[in-house]
Amino acid sequence: MSTDSQCPVTGRANKHAARVGRMNRDWWPNQLNLKILHQHSPLSNPMGGNFNYSEEFKALDLAAVRNDIFELMTNSQDWWPADYGHYGPLFIRMAWHSAGTYRTGDGRGGARSGSQRFAPLNSWPDNANLDKARMLLWPIKQKYGKKISWADLLIFAGNCALESMGFKTFGFGGGREDIWEPGEDIYWGAEDTWLGDKRYSGERLLENPLAAVQMGLIYVNPEGPNGNPDPLAAAKDIRETFARMAMNDEETVALIAGGHTFGKCHGAGAATHVGPEPEGASIIEQGLGWKCSLGTGRGEHTITSGLEGAWTTNPVKWDNGFFDVLFSYDWALAKSPAGAHQWIPTDPAAKGTVPDAHNPAKRHAPMMLTTDLALKLDPIYGPISKRFHEQPDLFADAFARAWFKLTHRDMGPRACYLGPEVPAEDLIWQDPLPARNHELIDDQDIAELKGKIVTSGLSVSQLVSTAWASASTFRSSDRRGGANGARIRLAPQKDWEVNQPAQLKLVLETLEGIQKQFNSAQSGGKRVSIADLIVLGGCAAVELAARNAGHEIIVPFTPGRTDAAQEQTDVVAFAPLEPAADGFRNYLKTRYSVSAEELLVDRAQLLTLSAPEMTVLIGGMRVLDANADRSRHGVFTRRPGTLTNDFFVNLLDMGTTWNATSEAEDVFEGRDRVTGEMKWTGTRVDLIFGSNSLLRAQAEVYGCKDAQEKFVVDFIAAWSKVMNLDRFDIANS
């Protein structure tokens, strides 16, 4: 008889009773994943629904936290001794790697959620031994508790580390709220092995939206592409990867050189001495991983990246030492004790210029990584590095600004920053908005403006699609985009195909005429912005469409948006926000390897929509005739422009049979089951609401005979949510 007890539920002998059998996705791997729409449930959050992190952070004595971190950094612990007696370099790497997962392609990743605490990030090869950094910070977190999140603490500790070693940082903004389970919406790559690189195709074409070169790396391989020690080839990887993380060439050089001014690499021996990562380690390790069997397993015996050595002669002081060393020597390829490719000076005089991190009796030569030499040898990076070497103040300012951008890029506009150390300067990458300098319109003005809009000659379709185009650029991932600023009238958005530039121009000219007429009629300081008027136009159109369906209802509207200028808008930085697909407008720019319905769910997640909200918005946008190209696909109604539940009623009609119009199966014809008469055409995004069992369940709610009023109410609620996603001025007030 087995000594293992049987599970009281399944009756099976199993040491892991919580395990389950095959999941639905095991049987049907192509099943649409709606779970990304319902992440981070309050049920997983121990703080409770009434917890207000921003209020807690505002009550935090940030100076006291800084003092405690300063004290911690030079208080070396026997269980993980500090290199050079200072934990600063370790904390810089921790903060850098927390923020460095950000990518511009979809705005996901970054430091804002504190996700470095969870798998997979806590166990990525590139994050080896950062578990120790977080454990060292635990007494600080424990002391201040709910007043500072892990997400904020990781970044603030990095700032403190820089400051404690003599560097003046640009500032710090708090406000990052912790998540309590890993996010399921971030695609890290298709590889099934650490350091795999299936993400490349053709001649080193990197898959979107990925930025890192290999699975489990934050940026690039420091030994060179796939370990090939070619500095010029490494420069190409660096340029693409850092650009996909929102950094230009100068910012890239400043970040690499600034970061490598501090600390050292760890490769005291072969990787065979290193145990499992935290997620794979024994329960007795209590969250720690990478246990090392070489010598003491720590201090001078530490193995992390496999590379070994320091870049500068004083690794715990801010200076120009990185460039001094880089340009002072010629470099020869060598191998670390772990067998990793790195570079050492050809000049014998370099030996003994670098102190040992733990043994005062030892001295070493400096080393450089293949990626460091790229900063010297690349024809673009080289002159930038030379300029920084010759102008240390310029370098310091560039690094301060680039570090601030790195650690705050995913936080959104300055309105989201908290604390006394937020810089006053508006930075172009923050998508700045002008301050409001006028009195807001009131309810009477709103009613008057609605009347002018709906009698202006613009259709429900035109008004709805324009308002949606303006607001739906919002990405919850990095809080960019949205209707505030009315950037839809500026480059590059005004020229995006999905926004129907010719129609957009007509709508904007009409709304600007109404704006001018209204503003010029005011005797006081009252004004309406075009940003507000675009949204108000959409709201007025939805009200009219509801009225046409027999429902008198007011669509909520809150004025206060301002109008951004072109000079406040970085055209290059906004390019990644252009929709490759927008299922809500039945738009697909081209055919992709990912299905249209998957792209719809992805966009819904970025808009913070639940499955019911996504469903009701699709149904409403179709009957409001808001397709991007004015196509009839999915417009399952005989009365377009009227807010009815016809989309669901007709989609679920068993009197209709559907067939693809081509082998691509992206457009379908719906014909009468008896007569064969053509009734409708639709896309995958339309038909998925009848095909997918979960979405069909949602659609059936709105397709019932008693669902018309619920449909209108729910559509307006979801519409209003999207229109206000970027209204941080409201949320923070």
UniProtKB/Swiss-Prot annotation:
User: According to its UniProt record, how is this protein modified after translation?
Assistant: Formation of the three residue Trp-Tyr-Met cross-link is important for the catalase, but not the peroxidase activity of the enzyme.
Q: Is the keyword Cell membrane in the record?
A: no
| Molecular functions per Gene Ontology | catalase activity; heme binding; metal ion binding
Per its UniProt entry, what is the enzyme's top EC class, as one word?
A: oxidoreductase
The record's listing under Pfam families reads: peroxidase
Keyword Cell membrane appears in the UniProt entry: no
UniProt: heme b binding residues: H260
Q: Can you locate the Tryptophyl-tyrosyl-methioninium (Tyr-Met) (with W-96) cross-link?
A: Y219-M245
Q: Which cofactor does it need?
A: heme b
A biological process from GO: cellular response to hydrogen peroxide
Residues with site note (Transition state stabilizer): R93
Its keywords, alphabetically, are:
Heme, Hydrogen peroxide, Iron, Metal-binding, Oxidoreductase, Peroxidase
Task: Name the NCBIfam families on file.
Answer: cat_per_HPI, PRK15061.1
Name of the featured protein: Catalase-peroxidase
Recorded source organism is Geobacter sp. (strain M21)
Q: Gene behind this chain?
A: katG
